């Protein structure tokens, strides 16, 4: 697989469209960090890391509003990809939906949201947009 982050986002997107409550994805350090950000910002209900004999599995519980039949994540968009990396400085950090969404950025200080990167004045690679 050439782009594990795109695979992770696609698995989440497919589970949302199918109406699944829980989705299992192969674990990696960057996927764990992205999942933690999604949980902290309220886009997913819960997550659990399960150790197995190889790399482990992340089980993500998706968040839905059952009364209106909508989910918390409207769109997951991969920005920087292996064929075309997108790096930005903290001054040029993108604002997703004028601040209503988040951009997940990989910086020298770790994976964080666009707002945190602006506050710490650190740039990096824009991994994806979530709104």
From Swiss-Prot:
Pfam families according to UniProt: Ribosomal_S8 (PF00410)
Domain of life: Bacteria
Keywords from the UniProt entry: Ribonucleoprotein, Ribosomal protein, RNA-binding, rRNA-binding
UniProt keyword annotation of Mitochondrion present: no
GO biological process: translation
PROSITE patterns the record matches: RIBOSOMAL_S8
A molecular function (GO) term: structural constituent of ribosome
Record-linked InterPro entries: Ribosomal_uS8, Ribosomal_uS8_CS, Ribosomal_uS8_sf
GO CC annotation terms, alphabetical: ribonucleoprotein complex; ribosome
Protein family membership: Belongs to the universal ribosomal protein uS8 family.
Annotated function: One of the primary rRNA binding proteins, it binds directly to 16S rRNA central domain where it helps coordinate assembly of the platform of the 30S subunit.
Subunit structure: Part of the 30S ribosomal subunit. Contacts proteins S5 and S12.
Protein name: Small ribosomal subunit protein uS8
Organism per entry: Porphyromonas gingivalis (strain ATCC BAA-308 / W83)
Gene: rpsH
């Amino acid at each position: 697989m050439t782009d594990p982050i795109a695979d992770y986002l696609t698995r989440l997107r497919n589970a949302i469209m199918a109406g699944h409550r829980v989705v299992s994805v192969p674990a990696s350090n960057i996927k764990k960090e992205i999942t933690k950000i999604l949980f902290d910002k309220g886009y997913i209900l819960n997550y659990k890391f399960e150790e197995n004999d190889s790399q482990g599995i992340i089980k993500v519980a998706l968040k839905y509003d059952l009364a209106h039949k909508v989910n918390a994540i409207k769109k997951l968009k991969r920005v920087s990809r292996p064929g075309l990396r997108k790096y930005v400085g903290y001054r040029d950090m993108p604002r997703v939906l004028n601040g209503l969404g988040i951009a997940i950025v990989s910086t020298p200080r770790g994976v964080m949201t666009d707002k945190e990167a602006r506050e710490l004045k650190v740039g990096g690679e824009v991994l994806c947009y979530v709104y």
